[in-house]
């Protein structure tokens, strides 16, 4: 497995643990269609959360404020478009009622592989920011 794929999987696992500790119920992971993939699908307080995970390797995950690159930089317009299509497909495929509240969040994961730890910064409801 390529290192970036391995970092991505580690980031998804760290994010799942983070979400569970925050009271989320994990409904699924890596829901994929031809057009794209949703990394994590979760639920909390009657709201569905579609969580896109972007991870980067850092030397020190406790000091992320002055980094030149951040995980959210990896959410390109093309990836964003595919994510929106995949979310809409999921809602239809799973017959989710129209009145169900949902949002798309971005989990930015900073991974220190040497210290074997990570840090999650969760950006809420990025759909409004990207519209």
Where on the chain are the PLM-derived regions?
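Domain-level recognition of nuclease-like catalytic cores that cleave nucleotide substrates
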Residues: 92-131
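Conserved catalytic cores of phosphodiester-cleaving nucleases, focusing on short active-site segments
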Residues: 19, 40-66, 83
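Mid-chain, well-packed structural core segment of small domains
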Residues: 67-102
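Mixed-charge, glycine-accented linear interaction segment located at domain edges/termini
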Residues: 31-33
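Residues at secondary-structure transition points
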Residues: 2, 6, 10, 35, ...
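Acidic-basic catalytic patches of nuclease active cores, encompassing PD-(D/E)XK
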Residues: 1-29
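Conserved protein-kinase catalytic-loop segment immediately C-terminal to the catalytic Asp
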Residues: 39-42, 108-110
């Amino acid at each position: 497995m390529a290192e970036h794929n391995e970092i991505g999987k580690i980031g998804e696992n760290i994010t799942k643990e983070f979400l569970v500790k925050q009271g989320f119920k994990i409904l699924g992971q890596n829901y994929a269609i031809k057009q794209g993939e949703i990394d994590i699908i979760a639920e909390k307080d009657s709201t569905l959360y579609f969580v896109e995970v972007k991870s980067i390797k850092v030397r020190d995950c406790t000091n992320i404020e002055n980094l030149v690159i951040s995980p959210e930089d990896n959410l390109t317009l093309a990836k964003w478009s595919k994510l929106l299509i995949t979310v809409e497909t999921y809602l239809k495929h799973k017959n989710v009622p129209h009145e169900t509240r949902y949002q798309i969040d971005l989990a930015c994961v900073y991974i220190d592989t040497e210290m074997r730890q990570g840090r999650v910064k969760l950006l809420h409801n990025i759909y409004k920011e990207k519209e």
